[in-house]
């Protein structure tokens, strides 16, 4: 297992994420609210989040929120899927929101250009103000931080939360907004108290040649992020992600004794 000096990299879990999330909550979420205000003025009733990899998973989680607590039409679509199979309805009552950390994802930029050409409101969420994606969108937010899962989730969540608040208030939405304010403290606690346990689990998992990740509901996108983005991209571990309700319908038949099956199926 790699022994990495966390002070030399910016993509690992560190206490810096606490300050980054605090900054996003205080500075960037209000910017999202400004964009939503414009969406409401334009009678936007359909939102397309377009992204790839981890940002797409964050957008999918926000879509789940919209589906559960509202009748908003919210979609989370991979970049090339949006470009190659462009939704039939793409007009001036739609919003296309592109999410790309480094801001150069070709298909996400193209999706924004398609949306803008059809009259849709377009917005980009990215790390830097000079990223190419910002020139393709009418609105942009450059969050200037590294803990992208938390940031993308907060920004996409904030779009949906604010839209529901303004158009069709739901009792649970206020509770969720209040809970999000506790996120920095919760993250700090997890970083301080779980790192050693995580290291021990990582050492154990490093011996496994393949890992199945099983999840459902709002945790299914997170399951994909961990099972594919983290395990395959970052650690080169073979594996797949399976919806928990489908696990017993076939996949369970090939699970061998001793094979690891991480489960993230609870809310």
PLM features per residue range, with description:
Residues 42-179, 183, 258, 265-267:
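Glycine-rich phosphate-binding loops that contact phosphosugars or nucleotide phosphates
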Residues 6-45, 141, 147-148, 162-244, ...:
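Active-site phosphate/pyrophosphate-binding segments
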């Amino acid at each position: 297992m790699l022994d990495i000096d966390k002070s030399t990299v910016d993509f690992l879990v560190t206490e810096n994420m606490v300050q980054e999330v605090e900054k996003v909550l205080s500075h960037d979420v209000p910017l999202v609210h400004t964009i939503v205000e414009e969406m409401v003025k334009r009678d936007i009733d359909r939102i397309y989040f377009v992204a790839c990899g981890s940002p797409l998973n964050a957008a999918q989680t926000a879509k789940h929120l919209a589906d559960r607590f509202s009748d908003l039409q919210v979609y989370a679509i991979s970049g090339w899927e949006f470009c190659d199979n462009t939704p039939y309805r793409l007009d001036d009552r739609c919003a296309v929101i592109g999410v790309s950390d480094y801001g150069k994802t070709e298909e996400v930029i193209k999706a924004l250009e398609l949306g803008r050409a059809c009259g849709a409101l377009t917005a980009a969420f990215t790390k830097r103000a000079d990223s190419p994606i910002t020139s393709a969108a009418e609105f942009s937010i450059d969050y200037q931080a590294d803990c992208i899962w938390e940031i993308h989730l907060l920004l996409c969540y904030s779009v949906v939360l604010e839209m529901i608040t303004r158009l069709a208030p739901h009792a649970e939405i206020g509770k969720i907004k209040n809970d999000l304010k506790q996120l920095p403290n919760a993250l700090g606690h997890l970083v301080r108290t779980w790192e050693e346990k995580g290291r021990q689990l990582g050492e154990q998992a490093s011996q496994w040649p393949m890992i199945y990740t099983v999840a459902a509901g709002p945790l299914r996108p997170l399951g994909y992020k961990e099972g594919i983005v983290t395990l395959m991209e970052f650690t080169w571990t073979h594996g797949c992600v399976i919806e928990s309700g489908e696990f017993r319908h076939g996949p369970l038949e090939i699970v061998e004794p001793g094979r690891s099956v991480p489960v993230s199926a609870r809310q």
